[in-house]
């Protein structure tokens, strides 16, 4: 009796082509001629990256990354981003492989990190989808040890219930803990005046006669003017204000004592041509401001009027 042999289904292949390869029909036709079109599918990488194409799940045994018309993988690898590798990894069968058309290694390429994040494992110059079996990702969780006196389940799978009353747990009242140094106010106290302290008895005569200890910050420093603190309480701020007032009064007194007599003034005839400013228009309403002008600082005057200067050394 002849023994029937089980025939394994043909392996399906997915070709991922860059956009420039589709523009060269002759190059694309020569690539497709090497594969059986009945078990081979062709998809464009730009359409996969844009989400325009949805790949079937667990369908392909092999996914090949095609080179462009110049036989370079640069364009294809640039389009193999996370949006492409995720669907490609899902479309691979367990133990399915992702590799390049020319067989060059992809482990050192730019898509190595994204391929690992998509769930693929580096293997023989490409990437392979691990086979986790039927219990893919199943992990048994134990939520505690089995109790010793727990009743066994019945034949139908039901578990008998235990309706024994549990002993009530005695709840002890919580005693508040008072922190150390904390007291309580006796509200029954009438707070008589006898309990108050006389402020006059806090300091004796000897305490009042003691010299005031000036802080180091308030003591005079060599070469610097004394400065009072912001919240000065030693009297330094008041003394500094008093000293400033005395200096200002003395300066005002000296200023008032400077007065010029009639003999200190000089008469000038402006009909005589003398020194003029650089613009020659000092009498048009502005004060004299030119450097070296004998009238610098004086108010403006009209031509020909008599002017008295405060300086006898003017040369006209």
Swiss-Prot record:
> What superkingdom heads the lineage?
Eukaryota
Key words of the record: 2Fe-2S, 4Fe-4S, Cytoplasm, Iron, Iron-sulfur, Metal-binding, Mitochondrion
> For the region Fe-S binding site B, what residue ranges are annotated?
279-293
Q: Where is this region: Fe-S binding site A?
A: 218-234
Q: Region labeled Linker — which residues? A: 140-208
InterPro entries annotated for this entry? Anamorsin (IPR007785), CIAPIN1 (IPR046408), Dre2_N (IPR031838)
State the family named in the UniProt similarity comment for this chain: Belongs to the anamorsin family.
Description of how the protein assembles with itself and partners = Monomer. Interacts with TAH18. Interacts with MIA40.
Q: What is this protein called?
A: Fe-S cluster assembly protein DRE2
Report the gene name: DRE2
């Amino acid at each position: 009796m002849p023994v029937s042999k089980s025939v394994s289904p043909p392996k399906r292949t997915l070709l991922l082509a860059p956009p420039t390869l589709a523009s060269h029909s002759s190059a694309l036709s020569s690539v497709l001629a090497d594969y059986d079109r009945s078990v081979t599918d062709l998809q464009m990488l730009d359409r996969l990256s844009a989400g325009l194409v949805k790949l079937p799940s667990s369908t392909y045994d092999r996914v090949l990354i095609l080179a462009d018309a110049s036989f370079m993988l640069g364009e294809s690898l640039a389009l193999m981003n996370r949006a492409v590798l995720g669907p490609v990894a899902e479309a691979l069968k367990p133990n399915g492989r992702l590799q390049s058309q020319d067989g060059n290694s992809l482990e050192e390429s730019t898509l190595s990190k994204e391929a690992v994040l998509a769930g693929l494992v580096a293997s023989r110059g490409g990437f392979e989808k691990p086979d986790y079996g039927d219990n893919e990702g199943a992990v048994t969780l134990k939520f505690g040890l089995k109790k010793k006196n727990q009743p066994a389940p019945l034949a139908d799978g039901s578990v008998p219930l235990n309706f024994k009353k549990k002993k009530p747990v005695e709840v002890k009242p919580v005693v508040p803990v008072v922190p150390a140094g904390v007291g309580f106010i006796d509200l029954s106290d009438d707070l008589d005046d006898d309990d108050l302290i006389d402020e006059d008895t806090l300091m004796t005569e000897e305490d009042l006669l003691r010299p005031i200890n000036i802080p180091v910050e308030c003591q005079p420093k060599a070469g610097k003017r004394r400065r009072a603190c912001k919240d000065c309480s030693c009297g330094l701020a008041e003394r500094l204000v008093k000293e400033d007032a005395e200096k200002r009064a003395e300066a005002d007194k000296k200023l008032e004592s400077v007065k010029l007599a009639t003999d200190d003034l000089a008469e000038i005839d402006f009909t005589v041509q003398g020194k003029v400013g650089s613009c020659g228009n000092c009498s048009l309403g502005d004060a004299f401001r030119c450097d070296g002008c004998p009238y610098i600082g004086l108010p403006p005057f009209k031509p020909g009027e008599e002017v008295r200067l405060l300086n006898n050394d003017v040369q006209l």
